[in-house]
């Protein structure tokens, strides 16, 4: 082991009368024979011829030129030789920056400070470096819409082997909304992104960038969710079930094709019918503002009579008695010169001439109005009346006591009975006139002989 503290008293000094080894070395060597070398060190091994009782362990001693101390009595020595050279092997400064540079960039958790503290009590201090806080990694944005689809790289897109198409779905209010089936996964992902932006705003988790859908969102910003989903389905290649090339047609497992209108169109049809019936007070499925065009068209067509009743009038005559069938006095038959009336065929007969039961002496008009127009054909009807009186003279009721013989029918065509048989669908029973009683035969029948 090397003893670097050579200026201290060694055991050899006691054997030479208290003189140090450096002093003896100076006295033995002359000034002319001593060679001074700067920057180099010489070492000499001295085998001392000590006494027999001296310690045998003292074998050799190392001497360093940098620790040589010149004698003050020698005046011929140079100033460089007389001056003591002091070199500190360990820095005294408290900071260990120099040692850290020497050690390099090797990092150690704990290291011992070997420098001497002259101010303090000289205790060895264990310095623990302050740990540098590790950089906090950026938090990865956690998806709020669940994991990605296993069958597709895009969110909200699923491939179905049965149909062979890519279908897009989105969750809204706890329900899965079908957006349509597409031939490619890219088209299905586009449909999902549009629906996600419409439902959840610009913070939605989408497959592509938000700038790709700016123009699309401007066009559909006034549409509701149901209307927007209906548009996306219209852009798809069909419905999820079946493989029909026609829109709205579905193939079921039983092998039958079914035509569907969908809830959206059904609600629209109901709302339009309710508005046409109840106007602005109607209760609709969608907002009333979306049917503003229907309301305006209804107000323009308010003067149109949608009554399905049959009217034969050409003018705007008011309804009479709330009936759907109107028969005004100026009918088509009246314009042709035919008067729809029934005259009493027995106006000129004597009192004792019987009249048929149910005959009337008043003219019958279908509209119930008082006749104010005389037909020119009335004269011809009066001439025919005299002929009819001769034909009807043999008609009458059988007097009591006479045999019930079949009377011969008058020659010529028989007139049809007037209101004798009710219509089959009218629901009224057939009307059959009954002969008057005996008390009402005065003036109509002869007395018994």
Curated annotation (Swiss-Prot):
It is found in: Nucleus. Signal peptide: none annotated. Residues 408-418 have a biased composition (Pro residues). GO terms for molecular function: DNA binding; DNA-binding transcription factor activity. InterPro entries: AP2/ERF_dom, AP2/ERF_dom_sf, DNA-bd_dom_sf. Induction: Repressed by miR172a-2/EAT. GO terms for biological process: ethylene-activated signaling pathway. The keyword DNA-binding applies. Keywords: Activator, DNA-binding, Ethylene signaling pathway, Nucleus, Repeat, Transcription, Transcription regulation. PROSITE patterns: AP2_ERF. CDD domains: AP2. SMART domains: AP2 (SM00380). Residues 1-52, 124-153, 393-449 are annotated as: Disordered. One of its GO terms (cellular component) is nucleus. Residues 153-209, 243-292 bind DNA. Residues 7-20, 27-46 have a biased composition (Polar residues). Probably acts as a transcriptional activator. Binds to the GCC-box pathogenesis-related promoter element. May be involved in the regulation of gene expression by stress factors and by components of stress signal transduction pathways. Regulates negatively the transition to flowering time and confers flowering time delay. Belongs to the AP2/ERF transcription factor family. AP2 subfamily. This is Ethylene-responsive transcription factor RAP2-7. The lineage of its organism: Eukaryota, Viridiplantae, Streptophyta, Embryophyta, Tracheophyta.
